[in-house]
C-alpha cells in the first residue's frame, strides 16, 4: 500500500513540482494549499486533469493549529514547504514571517508529535547561512540572520531540531540552495531576467550583479526531497541540496541575454539592491552529505536547466501572468 503524504505549500513553485514528482513515484498525495475565496489551487490548477484527479486538496492556513492537525490526520509523511519567502517583503512585514514560518512550522511539528507521523521533512533555505565564511558551505557552517526572512527560517530549523532532540520526532531539515525552473515567481532573479527579455525590453533592470548563487533546477530539488525521505539515515539531520558550483548574478544575466536577446543590456536599479549588511554575497553549497546518505545526484547542469526554463516562459500561456514592467517583491 502506498504511503499517504501531505505537501504543504503545494500550490506554489517547488510544492507543485514536488506533488507531481510524488504522484509519479506512486505516493498517495494530499495537497495543503492556502485558502482563498477564488478556490484557486495555484500552480496545481495548471496540471493535466488526470494528475489533478489523483490529488486530495485541503484548503487551509498553515498558521491555524486546528486546520493543520485536521490536514495531517491519517498522514504517514509530511513535506512542509509552506512559507513566506520574499526577502524584500520581509523587511517591512516581519510579523507575517514570524507567524507563517515559525508558528506554521511549530503547528506541523506539534501535530506530527500528537498524531505519530512517521516522517517530517521541514524545508529550510540556503539563506540561513548568510554570506559564505568558507566554501563549499556544508551543514556545519554558522547560521546568520541577514534578513527577517532568513531569521525566521533559522528559528523554524531550530524548532525542528528541538522536536527531534526533545521528543524523538523523526524530523529532517532539508536545505535546498537557490532553486529555479518553470512556475517560479517573478520575485526571483531568473524569472525577472527572462520575463524582461522575452517582453522585448532591451534594458534589463537588476540589483547587485556581484553576488554568486548555487543554482539548482527544480526537478533536482524535488527529487532530493523524495530521496531524503526514503533513507532512515537522514532522520535528525540537516541536509543541503546543492550543485556544488556557483555563478554571479551578472554572469547569469549575460548567459540568458545571449540565449534570448543579444542586443539587451543590464541596468542597475537601485531599488532592487538589498541593504549592504543584508546582502548575501556568496552561496556555494556542499552536496557531500546528501550524496553520502542517499543515492541523489544532480541531473541538470545550468545550461540545460536555463534552456528548459526559457522554453517554458516562451509559451504565452505561461508568461501572461508575469508583470515584467514592475519590481516584483
Regions found by a protein language model. Name each.
Residues 70-71, 111, 196, 224, ...:
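CheY-like receiver
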Residues 182-187, 210-222, 238-258, 274, ...:
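Substrate-binding strand-loop-helix patch
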Residues 1-179, 249, 308, 312-313, ...:
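N-terminal Rossmann-like NAD(P)+-binding domain of SDR-like oxidoreductases, especially those catalyzing
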Residues 49-55, 167-170, 194-205, 231, ...:
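A short C-terminal helix-loop "cap" of Rossmann-like NAD(P)-dependent dehydrogenase/epimerase domains
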Residues 18, 193, 225-229, 253-256, ...:
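Hydrophobic "lid"/C-terminal helical patch
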Residues 208, 236-239, 250-253, 261-282, ...:
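C-terminal "lid/loop" region of Rossmann-like NAD(P)-dependent oxidoreductases
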Residues 63, 92, 100-103, 147, ...:
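Residue-level signal for the nucleotide or nucleotide-sugar donor/cofactor binding architecture
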Residues 154, 179-192, 199-202, 218-219, ...:
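Glycine/proline-rich active-site loop of Rossmann-fold NAD(P)-dependent oxidoreductases
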